[in-house]
Amino acid sequence: MNMIKIEPYIPTDISIEEISTNRIRISAYPFESGYAITLAHPIRRLLLSSSVGYAPTALRIQGVTHEFDSIRGIVEDVSHFITNLKNIRFLIKDTESDNVQLHYEFKGPMVLSANELVNDMVGIVNPEAYLATINENASLSFSLIVQKGIGYVPSESIRGKISEDYIPLDAYFTPVKKAVYEIENVLVEDNPNYEKIVFDIETDGQIEPITAFKEAIAIMHKQMSIFGVDLSTASSGTRNISEDSGELKTLMIKIDTLNLSARCFNCLDRSGLKYVGELVIMSENELKNIKNMGKKSYDEIADKLEELGYPVGGEIADDILPLLNRKLAKLKSN
């Protein structure tokens, strides 16, 4: 006969294992049945969407007027230069600063890599990353704005906040490359129905994975603190979601701005899929069953959605989903 409980079991064991540089495994147990998934899923979402990182947000290149231009004496055109630049992971050295403006000048011939961008204001966590090749008798002069932020911000949202001579960049701030979890059963006092959460977390080096995990827990605690008020005096109003909300803006990002491979983009485009929100509301099987969707294309889409804070199979808030569906239906009817 099972003993009657008057409160849920409190987990007592936690372990942290360093798998490799910038990757850890965290195990915690035992949880009551159902508690593990309840806690693990929002923590994973917070890790992917709310961890603070750094990214270039605007670029100005001497002699260049737009992002589809070429750069005299440089092997890469502007669009390829921007793609390479976005792969470089910066660190602002002054922890009190939210943004820095940088200026660089280089003369060829040389192969320009990320380590050449290190100075008194910024560091680079992947110094071996390739940026450009400068030909003999050529030079490259450019200015760059690097900012601190969370999640993903499309270039359209940045355009109106910078001077007209700068090119706005899609900003991928999140430093968390991977955040997955598994739920395992564990035995407690002859009861096999207790659960263990095992997190696998990897970052790009801008932040240590254990720090990202602690910050996600802190964010969750702050968000939950609203329920610590006296509920008898709390307002009964529901959340008012506007069309300008950050969450909705992310879901309405156009797929053609995500820098997907040509094969992957064409697969989605031929299926009439234009917006991130259309992918987010699809199940894993629905995504995989898109015509001509191969494994590489699926993995590329899954990684991109995870960067945006919407892993495949995840959930959209109940108050966001109707507004998203209305906007998509309106756009499709035009």
From Swiss-Prot:
- Which reaction does this enzyme catalyse, per its entry? RNA(n) + a ribonucleoside 5'-triphosphate = RNA(n+1) + diphosphate
- Please give the residue ranges the record annotates as the region Alpha N-terminal domain (alpha-NTD): 1-231
Mind telling me what this protein is named?
DNA-directed RNA polymerase subunit alpha
Q: Which SMART domains match?
A: RPOLD
Q: Which Pfam family, giving just one, matches this sequence?
A: RNA_pol_A_CTD
GO cellular component term of the entry, any: cytoplasm
The cross-references to NCBIfam families, in alphabetical order and at most eight, read: PRK05182.2-3, PRK05182.2-5, rpoA
Q: Which GO BP terms sit in this record? A: DNA-templated transcription
Region of interest (Alpha C-terminal domain (alpha-CTD)), residue spans: 247-334
Q: Which UniProt keywords apply?
A: DNA-directed RNA polymerase, Nucleotidyltransferase, Transcription, Transferase
**What is the annotated role of this protein in its UniProt record?**
DNA-dependent RNA polymerase catalyzes the transcription of DNA into RNA using the four ribonucleoside triphosphates as substrates.
Signal peptide interval: none
The domain comment in this protein's record states: The N-terminal domain is essential for RNAP assembly and basal transcription, whereas the C-terminal domain is involved in interaction with transcriptional regulators and with upstream promoter elements.
Q: What is its EC number?
A: 2.7.7.6
Task: Describe the subunit structure.
Answer: Homodimer. The RNAP catalytic core consists of 2 alpha, 1 beta/beta' and 1 omega subunit. When a sigma factor is associated with the core the holoenzyme is formed, which can initiate transcription.
Give GO MF terms, alphabetically: DNA binding; DNA-directed RNA polymerase activity; protein dimerization activity
Q: Does the keyword Nucleotide-binding apply?
A: no
| Family affiliation | Belongs to the RNA polymerase alpha chain family.
